[in-house]
Amino acid sequence: MKSKFAVLFFTLFLLALAIDNVTTICPPGCICNRQSVGLTCKPSPGSDMSARECLKKTCSYGYC
C-alpha cells in the first residue's frame, strides 16, 4: 500500500513540474520580465502594448 502511494505521489509531483514548465512565449511588443516571480511578460521599450495585455502571458526560462 505504501509503495502505491509513493508511486502516485511521485507521478503527481512530476505532472506538476511538467505543467509548470508549459508556458507561452511573450507576444510581439512584450518582453520577459526577469525580475518578476513566475517570469511574466512586460511591454518592451518603445512598444505600444499595455502592461495589462503583456501580463496575460508568461514566459518560460528558455525564452528569457
From Swiss-Prot:
Where in or outside the cell it occurs: the entry states: Secreted
Q: Which residues cross the membrane?
A: none
Cite the GO molecular-function annotations of the record: toxin activity
Q: What is its main location?
A: secreted
Organism superkingdom: Eukaryota
UniProt entry keywords in alphabetical sequence? Disulfide bond, Neurotoxin, Secreted, Signal, Toxin
Q: Which GO terms of the cellular component aspect does the record hold?
A: extracellular region
Found, by tissue, as follows: Expressed by the venom gland.
Report if keyword Transmembrane helix is assigned: no
Q: Where is the signal peptide?
A: 1-18
The protein's PTM annotation reads: Contains 3 disulfide bonds.
Question: Which protein family is it in?
Answer: Belongs to the scolopendra neurotoxin 6 family.
Give the protein name, as stated in the record.
Putative neurotoxin 4
Q: Which organism is it from?
A: Scolopendra mutilans
